[in-house]
Regions:
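Adenosine-cofactor binding site in Rossmann-like domains, unifying the SAM/SAH pocket
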Residues: 21-44
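NAD(P)H-binding glycine-rich loop region in Rossmannoid oxidoreductase-like domains
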Residues: 39-78
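SDR active-site strand-loop-helix element
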Residues: 6, 29, 54-58, 95-100, ...
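Mid/C-terminal beta-alpha module of Rossmann-like enzyme folds, strongest
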Residues: 191-192, 198-256
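Amphipathic terminal alpha-helices
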Residues: 281-300
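Catalytic helix-loop patch of NAD(P)-dependent Rossmann-fold dehydrogenases
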Residues: 75, 79-83, 90, 103-145, ...
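NAD(P)-dependent short-chain dehydrogenase/reductase
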Residues: 136-194
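N-terminal Rossmann NAD(P)H-binding glycine-rich loop of SDR-like oxidoreductase domains
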Residues: 2-20
């Protein structure tokens, strides 16, 4: 299997470099090698490498900044994806793409299923949904993984920001009325590799194509995520300035941001679990692994 990975230096891309290697020949490219805003160059890149699988882990993810530069977000999250879908179809290659809970408006009272109506609230969400639609329009052999609240040991994310602030501040105010599942880049990468392996071994692999919700098990709030993370760090004797009682819950309206977020980011993963025979571990498991990794790095 010849795999072209785009976005190798991001949180998910970094983990994909590890998980995809056993599947065959991996060509991993980052921003320096491939500029997703240059659509002609992107097309030439795909044709030059002649992949059997394209894994697109590159995206415009600055949710609030996208409100001020929608054209750039659209070009990367939709325009570039449109090119990838066309080229995957031309080469009869599989295309793996990552989307987001932000394609939903968050008003549903229960977990979102893959076939629920979408209704993005932000430029970021709208461009990610447009990218999904480009893939479905151009190419049948695809996997679209919608995920949420992504974190990892590499790159910037909520978990690492909270750890930094907990060492600097006496008090933290964290949003407590948005619900979802913190999902590690490690889990996303491992599930991607397993899905591609199953496809490679299946005689009816076309039936496995489609959109799947890929998030960790369980649910929490941003406040619950932060509290649990800091409890684990404190248990490892890491000195924190903020005390547990000073990690305070606040409503969304108390922390206004340029881009609106869905209050309900819970996603039903039954389709993914049943199709690929997977057990998606509770979100706390991978948070523990993150803490272990970060603490061990600090100790070196």
């Amino acid at each position: 299997m010849r795999i072209l990975l785009l976005g190798k230096d991001g949180q998910v891309g970094w983990e994909l470099q590890r998980s995809l290697v056993p599947l065959g020949e991996l060509i991993a490219l980052g921003r320096q090698e491939t500029d997703l805003e240059d659509l002609d160059a992107l097309r030439r890149c795909v044709r030059a490498h002649r992949p059997e699988v394209i894994v697109n882990a590159a995206a415009y993810t600055a949710v609030d900044k996208a409100e001020a530069e929608p054209e750039k977000a659209q070009r990367i999250n939709a325009g570039a994806v449109d090119v990838l879908a066309e080229e995957a179809n031309r080469a009869n290659a599989w295309l793996v793409h990552y989307s987001t809970d932000y394609v939903f408006d968050g008003k549903k009272s229960s977990a979102y299923r893959e076939d629920d109506p979408t209704g993005p609230l932000s430029v970021y969400g709208k461009t990610k949904l447009e990218g999904e639609q480009c893939i479905r329009q151009h190419h049948a052999k695809h996997l679209i993984f919608r995920t949420s609240w992504v974190y990892g040991a590499r790159g910037g994310n909520f978990a690492k920001t909270i750890l930094r602030l907990a060492k600097e501040k006496d008090e933290l105010n964290i949003i407590a009325d948005q619900h979802g599942a913190p999902t590690s880049a490690e889990l996303i990468a491992d599930v991607t590799a397993l899905a591609l392996y199953r496809i490679s071994q299946s005689e009816s692999h076309a039936t496995l194509a489609g959109t799947y919700h890929l998030v960790a098990g369980g649910e929490t709030t941003w406040h619950g995520f932060a509290r649990h993370l800091l409890e684990l760090v404190r248990a490892r004797d890491v000195e924190l300035k903020v005390q547990p009682e000073n990690v305070r819950p606040i409503p969304t309206e108390a922390y206004p941001l340029p881009a609106k977020r869905p209050q309900n980011s819970r996603m039903d993963t039954a389709k993914l679990s049943n199709t690929f025979s997977l057990h998606l571990t509770n979100w706390r498991y991978h948070v523990q692994r993150l803490v272990d990794e970060l603490v061990s790095q600090t100790a070196k």
